Amino acid sequence: HGIQDSIGNRNAPALFNLAWHKEFMWDGAIHHIEAQALAPLHDSRELGSSIEALISKLQSSGFYQTEFFKVYGDSLINSKRVLQSLSAFELSLVSLQSKYDRVNQGKEVFTEQEKQGYLLFQNHCNRCHREPLFSNFEYLDNGLTVDPFLQDFGRFLITNVEKDKYKFKVPSLRNISYTYPYMHDGRFDKLRQVLVHYGNITVHSRGSD
């Protein structure tokens, strides 16, 4: 939910490991991480504000004036510094210390159940959710039925190429237990629902990738 409990078209993407992304948002509309921060700020259903209003609030805060002085050597607060600071924070959010990583480093081993799960993953999920970041960063059709209210055409809205209709950026599976709800529109609350969806993917009338 955004400002005044407004509901947008899409689920908020996770922020970790953005350093490895070349494009941002579900449809890849943004190509620079500093510009990404402006999207939710300007969206009337998210923050419904502007960079000017944000700067004004920060400038009126003695706390932020002090913090900017610590970083930049003076207390000037402008759009360039605000966006640099936000992107620096986002780039610091790195997920590379999971049990999976420790297993790859030879520090731990999977349980038998985890081994079976990993094998299933490699056979059925790894084509799109490629290791070690668990995304191939491509735009694919996930086979979901189209919400008649949202009518979200995905990547097509950016490229205007017919084959890009209903394609969305493949999300990373890292920290998956913490990033619910799932899918680009947040329609699934449980990971099991996602697995059932992909298990039944052939029943959908629209082809999927």
Regions found by a protein language model. Give the residues of each.
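Periplasmic c-type cytochrome electron-transfer domains
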Residues: 1-209
